[in-house]
């Protein structure tokens, strides 16, 4: 329980510092829309095109990427599904060749933007933005205008790089905790089960009699 609580606390701490780093007042930086600073488009493939041992990563509608033997793009981009599980919450950062589903979006930042800065900003702010923009209580699908009109701060490239360096370190720390703590929790649970079984393993009467003979 302590380890699980620690993991939750660290994630909350990370989110707090990330949001603080990504807080810009109206007059502090130039504000544009995502459509003004990035190319936004979709892919052409369907989920049924996937091949288990395909050569290239294939970003579809699910949380986890698939594989395909052909690629659509060779670039640095932020990818997210247009609908399906985790819509508006799950984002992938890709560098190199990849294939893309027809209902998944690619966001390719222009020269004024550090791609990692755009990635962190979208991960932090996009879901809240689409919830406010949606007429229903839950967002089930994304449309291109949602991306085009998404507000985007444009600090200097130097400042973007400074923020990215900090947030990337936070990401690495959180990832190592997320991977390491569950293993530690599992190990502790196994240890507990072992000692519990040891405590409650009483010798059978026959064994006890034989031992006293």
Regions found by a protein language model. Give the residues of each.
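Charged, alpha-helix-forming regions
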Residues: 1-213
């Amino acid at each position: 329980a302590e380890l699980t609580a620690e993991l939750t606390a660290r994630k909350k701490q990370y989110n707090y510092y990330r949001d603080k780093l990504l807080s810009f007042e109206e007059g502090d930086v130039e504000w544009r829309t995502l459509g003004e600073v990035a190319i936004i488009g979709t892919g052409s493939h369907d989920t049924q095109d996937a091949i288990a041992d395909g050569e290239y990563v294939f970003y579809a509608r699910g949380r986890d990427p698939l594989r395909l033997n052909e690629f659509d793009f060779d670039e640095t981009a932020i990818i997210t599904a247009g609908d399906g599980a985790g819509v508006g919450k799950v984002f992938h950062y890709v560098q190199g060749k990849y294939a893309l589903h027809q209902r998944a979006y690619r966001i390719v930042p222009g020269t004024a933007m550090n791609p990692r800065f755009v990635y962190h900003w979208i991960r932090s702010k996009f879901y809240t933005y689409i919830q406010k923009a949606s007429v229903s209580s839950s967002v089930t699908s994304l449309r291109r205008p949602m991306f085009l009109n998404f507000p985007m701060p444009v600090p200097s490239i130097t400042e973007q790089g400074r923020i990215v360096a900090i947030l990337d370190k936070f990401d690495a720390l959180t990832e190592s905790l997320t991977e390491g703590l569950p293993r530690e929790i599992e190990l502790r649970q196994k240890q507990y089960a072992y000692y519990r079984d040891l405590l409650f393993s009483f010798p059978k009467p026959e064994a006890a009699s034989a031992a006293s003979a």
